[in-house]
């Protein structure tokens, strides 16, 4: 087999593998969102934000749970991901999902718009956490909840460029998440260390 044929075969195999794994990934996301919804007491009509929504699988799963009377803000900072999110929202006819262009130091969410906000493996990427935390607090209604799903620093992974040095590598210690968000004015309500993929989940409340 010549080099071009080998490369083509490898690309086809990779694409087929990616497609075959997609249903499992979507199912895992749906299961994780159901657990998060139970913890945060989402109901039909709840307004939720997924910060750093990526490919949208968690935001779209959330949209099913809050129903047509609810709303999900899906925010992203990456242009390609934003375009894909908007395309998927249109393709799926998701009238209760709003895609927003987030910023490095701001969620771009309306003030006091959300009953619940979650960041899944996003917080350790924040380069301006103090300003971003203030934006998160502004975006929550009184009595609203914030969930941070993260993992501790892991060996073998390069630190994210531009983040504070106290992260200790790629990831973030749970202690720092708690310190930063309580300093922003939120109340710690629960920590869970049995989240999928060896992640942890920390819940906060805006009084």
State the predicted function of each range.
Residues 28-46:
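Conserved alpha-helix/loop element of class I SAM-dependent methyltransferases that forms part
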Residues 43-46, 107-117:
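A short acidic, Gly/Pro-enriched loop at the edge of an enzyme's catalytic core
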Residues 44-54, 82, 145-176:
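Conserved class I S-adenosyl-L-methionine
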Residues 63-67, 130-145:
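A short glycine-rich, Lys/Arg-flanked "PGG" loop and its adjoining helix->strand segment in the class I
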Residues 113-130:
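A short SAM/SAH-binding and catalytic strip from SAM-dependent methyltransferases
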Residues 188-207:
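Core SAM-dependent methyltransferase catalytic element
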């Amino acid at each position: 087999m010549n080099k071009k044929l080998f490369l083509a075969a490898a690309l086809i195999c990779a694409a087929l593998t990616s497609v075959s794994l997609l249903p499992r990934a979507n199912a895992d996301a749906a299961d994780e969102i159901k657990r998060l919804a139970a913890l945060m007491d989402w109901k039909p009509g709840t307004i939720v934000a997924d910060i750093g929504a990526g490919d949208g699988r968690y935001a779209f799963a959330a949209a099913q749970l809050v129903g047509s009377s609810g709303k999900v803000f899906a925010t992203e900072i990456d242009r390609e991901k934003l375009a894909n999110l908007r395309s998927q929202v249109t393709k799926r006819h998701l009238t209760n999902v709003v895609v927003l262009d987030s910023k490095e130091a701001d969620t771009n969410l309306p003030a006091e718009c959300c009953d619940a906000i979650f960041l899944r493996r996003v917080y350790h990427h924040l380069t301006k956490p103090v300003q971003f935390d203030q934006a998160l607090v502004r975006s929550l209604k009184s009595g609203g909840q914030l969930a941070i799903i993260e993992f501790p620093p892991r060996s073998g992974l390069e630190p994210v460029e531009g983040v504070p040095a106290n992260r200790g590598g790629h990831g973030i210690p749970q202690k720092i998440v708690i310190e930063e968000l309580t300093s922003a004015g939120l109340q710690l309500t629960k920590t869970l260390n049995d989240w999928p993929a060896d992640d942890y989940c920390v819940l906060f409340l805006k009084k």
